[in-house]
Amino acid sequence: MQRLKQQQQQQQVMMQQALMQQQSLYHPGLLAPPQIEPIPSGNLPPGFDPSTCRSVYVGNIHIQVTEPLLQEVFAGTGPVESCKLIRKEKSSYGFVHYFDRRSAGLAILSLNGRHLFGQPIKVNWAYASGQREDTSSHFNIFVGDLSPEVTDAMLFTCFSVYPTCSDARVMWDQKTGRSRGFGFVSFRNQQDAQTAIDEITGKWLGSRQIRCNWATKGATSGEDKQSSDSKSVVELTSGVSEDGKDTTNGEAPENNAQYTTVYVGNLAPEVSQVDLHRHFHSLGAGVIEEVRVQRDKGFGFVRYSTHVEAALAIQMGNTHSYLSGRQMKCSWGSKPTPAGTASNPLPPPAPAPIPGFSASDLLAYERQLAMSKMAGMNPMMHHPQGQHAFKQAAMGATGSNQAIYDGGYQNAQQLMYYQ
């Protein structure tokens, strides 16, 4: 009986320890009680009180939608006081004013993302642009790996434990009306922004662990002011302006197939062109056609053969983001690839040096390995003599053409020869 009690006590202690360990992953700001009435994700300023609002903003409206049709659709959630449609060339937007707040809230919850003429509309609270603080001179951080249920309000609650947090926005897809899985948070004080990056990265928000970094190039060196004329972070990434109007640009990098270049920032001074090529080649995102590094400025570019490959490289590059001890920042290059640019894939980079073996040793071994694969033989990697076979292959290939087997191409073995 005594032994059973001891086992139960041990189990309780273990459960308490596990609970404490789990809670340590959460930031105090993430443990805030849920709101009584959820606020949908969108362009909503922190501190905005929807209980005083009876109007909704409607964006991404198909050009065939008329004002009477828009009013008819939104009248389904409650009596409409007035409706205004503002027509644009590619997509329109409008405002619907209800007699009561509950009808407006129901419209947001039930109509956001619904399709009109095959195009999903965006519905959110309408507000005057003066209700949002000007954050153009604030310090902005990027927040990635957001779960689909995270809203602007949840994101702001998470970071509002820092006194100078001024704004928080989740980016959402123009076509689907869904979260794009990342957002931006603004701070009046640079130190608060840096502390947030250090403390909240890896913490849980919703169902995922989030990651944080500076949203602009050069932020860690004090050059973190936005240098995008008067455009906000939201305009530049999601096509939504400060006043809730649609500014979608079909030529934005994510929408333009001519963009095939990845910008890589925050590179360590010792990172060379070969190092960057080797890192992105190891990701296996696609065919690399050009690699450039500005070592004195700490950034570089990697050009792929297609837009899709470049997009995948950005995603993977920000996931596997450390090179020479620094966390890289990957995004779209500033210019599209000129039409008619010839496709010339780069040969695979030379393998990284291994202590005890020279580059020529590695090249010779790779050549022997490739030849054995082509002949249907077992790779020398399984040779019982191990490194002896490695050295033997290297010595036997002295003076001959050297080759690298590109293991990234599983369907077609390629030999890239060097004199």
UniProtKB/Swiss-Prot annotation:
- State the source organism's domain of life: Eukaryota
Residues bearing PTM Phosphoserine: S241
Record's PANTHER family?
POLYADENYLATE-BINDING PROTEIN RBP47B, TRNA SELENOCYSTEINE 1-ASSOCIATED PROTEIN 1-RELATED-RELATED
Record domain RRM: where: 54-128, 139-217, 260-335
Quaternary organization: Interacts with UBA1A and UBA2A.
InterPro entries given in the database record: Nucleotide-bd_a/b_plait_sf, RBD_domain_sf, RBM42_RBP45_47-like, RRM_dom
The keyword Zinc-finger appears for this protein: no
**Which Pfam families does this entry report, sorted A to Z?**
RRM_1
- What protein does this entry describe? Oligouridylate-binding protein 1B
Q: Where in the cell is it found?
A: Nucleus
Region of interest: Disordered: 217-257
Which is one Gene Ontology cellular component term of this protein? nucleus
Name one process (GO BP) from the record. Answer: mRNA processing
